[in-house]
């Protein structure tokens, strides 16, 4: 083995050669610079933001949202788009299913006039458009709805009944190899919405799997399993769904956390309902019988009245959301993190 000084000299020479050939900073020591906090895009549900561990969806990463039909996958993605736009970001929606409802998106807070929308004919076209948009460096978030609808050109141009084994999986693998690096460089969040299929002949374990092969499972930094668990009713009328989201994979924080939130028909995720649920759970909002109170003031009798009160008082809703995140250590800004010796060094900022 070479002497320690010789090894150090050889390493410095190699680093100098790499910097000369590939540019300054191509290789660096992790301790040379202070790591920046993780930038996030809020999901619209405080419970889901907390379950993700960093206060939202990480920027510059691949996210997969999957689940059964009508479980709320697109709703979660559209809320993230709306939050990115509110922070001044530019969003794109690759509508491979040709099923985007602009009116519903607008009700969720999406600026549909500014939203970039593409309805591609083939999977190759969809992913090429995405690659060009991300490569521009101007995009903040892009949604692909859905992976199952990214049909390879050969399958579209072929006859019904032709076998096209593995074409979509190869297409996804090639695209993700190419796109992942650009997403990180441009800090663009890519949300892939995916559907469930059942594997034939599975007797042990879950037969469910997602479409598009295994590449997306590997490249995704966060995978969220979204399920509808209950129908919300007012009298005899159905007004929404209770939804459960499980963080199946998380490279940014501990995985397997579960969040529950309400999706109201025509309105999307109930932000105010989530604040009340989390506030009660963590002792910030008091519940006595059917009454909800905060700091001695009554919010309302029953969940619906309390929701309405917070909707009419957005400043109070924002204050409660901030208190919940502070108590749970999620969404702490760098200045706050530095002032607390016991606080973890890596914390998410609240947006951009």
Swiss-Prot record:
ATP binds at residues 67-74. One of its GO terms (cellular component) is cytosol. The keyword DNA damage applies. One of its GO terms (biological process) is DNA repair. Belongs to the RecA family. Residues 332-352 are annotated as: Disordered. Keywords: ATP-binding, Cytoplasm, DNA damage, DNA recombination, DNA repair, DNA-binding, Nucleotide-binding, SOS response. It holds the Pfam family RecA_C. Can catalyze the hydrolysis of ATP in the presence of single-stranded DNA, the ATP-dependent uptake of single-stranded DNA by duplex DNA, and the ATP-dependent hybridization of homologous single-stranded DNAs. It interacts with LexA causing its activation and leading to its autocatalytic cleavage. It is found in: Cytoplasm. InterPro entries: AAA+_ATPase, DNA_recomb/repair_RecA, DNA_recomb/repair_RecA_CS, P-loop_NTPase, RecA-like_C, RecA-like_N, RecA_ATP-bd, RecA_C_sf. It comes from the Bacteria. One of its GO terms (molecular function) is ATP-dependent DNA damage sensor activity. Residues 335-352 have a biased composition (Basic and acidic residues). This is Protein RecA.
């Amino acid at each position: 083995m070479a002497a320690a000084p010789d090894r150090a000299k050889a390493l410095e020479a190699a680093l100098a050669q790499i910097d000369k050939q590939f540019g300054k900073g191509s290789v660096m020591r992790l301790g040379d610079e202070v790591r920046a906090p993780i930038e996030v895009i809020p999901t619209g549900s405080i419970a889901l933001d907390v379950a993700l561990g960093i206060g939202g969806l990480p920027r510059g990463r691949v996210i997969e949202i999957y689940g059964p039909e009508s479980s709320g996958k697109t709703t979660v993605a559209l809320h993230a788009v709306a939050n990115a736009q509110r922070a001044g970001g530019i969003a794109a929606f690759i509508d491979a299913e040709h099923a985007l409802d602009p009116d519903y998106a607008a009700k969720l807070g999406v600026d549909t006039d500014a939203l970039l929308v593409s309805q591609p004919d083939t999977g190759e076209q969809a992913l090429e458009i995405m690659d060009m948009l991300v490569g521009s460096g101007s995009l903040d978030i892009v949604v692909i709805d859905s992976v199952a609808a990214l049909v390879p050109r050969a399958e579209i141009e072929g006859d019904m009944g032709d076998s096209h084994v593995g074409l979509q999986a190869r297409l996804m693998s090639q695209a993700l190899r190419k796109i992942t690096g650009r997403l990180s460089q441009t800090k663009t969040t890519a949300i892939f919405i995916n559907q469930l299929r059942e594997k034939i002949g599975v007797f042990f374990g879950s037969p469910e799997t997602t479409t598009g092969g295994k590449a997306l499972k590997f490249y995704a930094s966060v995978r969220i399993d979204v399920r509808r668990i209950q129908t919300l009713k007012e009298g005899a009328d159905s007004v929404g769904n209770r939804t459960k989201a499980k963080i199946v994979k998380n490279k940014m924080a501990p995985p397997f956390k579960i969040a529950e939130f309400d999706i109201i028909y025509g309105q999307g995720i109930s932000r105010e309902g989530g604040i009340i649920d989390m506030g009660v759970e963590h002792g910030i909002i008091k519940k006595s019988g059917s009454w909800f109170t905060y700091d001695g003031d009554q919010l309302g009798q029953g969940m619906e009245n309390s929701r309405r009160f917070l909707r009419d008082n957005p400043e109070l809703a924002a204050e409660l959301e901030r208190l919940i995140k502070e108590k749970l250590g999620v969404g702490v800004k760098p200045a706050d993190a530095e002032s607390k010796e016991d606080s973890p060094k890596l914390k998410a900022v609240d947006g951009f």
